Amino acid sequence: MPIKIPDTLPAFETLVNEGVRVMTETAAVRQDIRPLQIGLLNLMPNKIKTEIQIARLIGATPLQVELTLVRIGGYRPKNTPEEHLFAFYETWEEVKGRKFDGFIITGAPVETLDYEEVTYWDELKSIFEWTETHVHSTLNVCWGAMAAIYHFHGVPKYPLKEKAFGVYRHQNLKPSSVYLNGFSDDFAVPVSRWTEVRRADIDRVPSLEILMESKEMGVCLVHEKKGNRLYMFNHVEYDSTSLSDEYFRDVDAGVPIKLPHDYFPHNDADLPPQNRWRSHAHLFFGNWINEMYQTTPYELEKIGTGD
């Protein structure tokens, strides 16, 4: 089944050209099924690129999904035109009366700040609390995952001496997990962050279970059954060129940066990188959406009521 997004969203044409099944809003209303309602709180600076990355993965699943783009109310990003925000996004204040089958909270380029120093921290805390009563399943990504696990469990983040940057091998620690159905025992995941959470802190919280881990990069994916939350600390959603774009952005800005680990062929930045994580990215999002579909109430208003 396709993903339902506005016909004029820039991601629409890109996804159609890639062969992703996309449905116009007009066509969607003719299907006599309830689409899954998924919200995307997009905290990334380049919102259009993130929209494409997430919609690509959601749109490849066999279920109809209606994606709602959400933004922080009082914060104006510098890298996305205001007309795009007003045309396609709703503020959290505008959607907080609704309920969602799934909700994604992305990363943000603020990880070197203490959480309390982030401009929109108070609003984000309110959103975290809101997900407990208005969302069936929440997927927190990178800094969004670190912020969420800190908010709910006090798990701290630690600064790294240098940026964790590249493609690293990860291990499947729980092959029986519904979220890792079809996963290999060992697989590649893109990593791009300046901070980390540590296994020792997570192990102290009985409700948290580590599903993916890297010997070099540490914890990657944590599941919390009680709150129906996933914490993904790395970037399975990244495009083939995402790490390359970040690398050359920093090089052009004069920021000291090493070549991303195990990314460019022969460590030659002039060669196009090969995507070695795409299939597992699709598996992960497909598994998340399938589990959501199997367990969410048919009547949206029952989400968060325990019925």
UniProtKB/Swiss-Prot annotation:
Q: What is this protein called?
A: Homoserine O-acetyltransferase
In its UniProt entry, the species of origin is given as Sinorhizobium fredii (strain NBRC 101917 / NGR234)
**Role noted for this protein:** Transfers an acetyl group from acetyl-CoA to L-homoserine, forming acetyl-L-homoserine.
According to the UniProt entry, what is the EC number of this protein?
2.3.1.31
Kindly give the InterPro entries that the UniProt entry links to this protein: Class_I_gatase-like (IPR029062), HST_MetA (IPR005697), MetA_family (IPR033752)
Residues forming the catalytic site:
142, 235, 237
Which residues of this protein are annotated with the site description Important for acyl-CoA specificity?
A: 111
- Report keywords, A-Z: Acyltransferase, Amino-acid biosynthesis, Cytoplasm, Methionine biosynthesis, Transferase
Give the Pfam families listed for this entry.
HTS
Record pathway = Amino-acid biosynthesis; L-methionine biosynthesis via de novo pathway; O-acetyl-L-homoserine from L-homoserine: step 1/1
Q: Which residues bind substrate?
A: 163, 192, 249
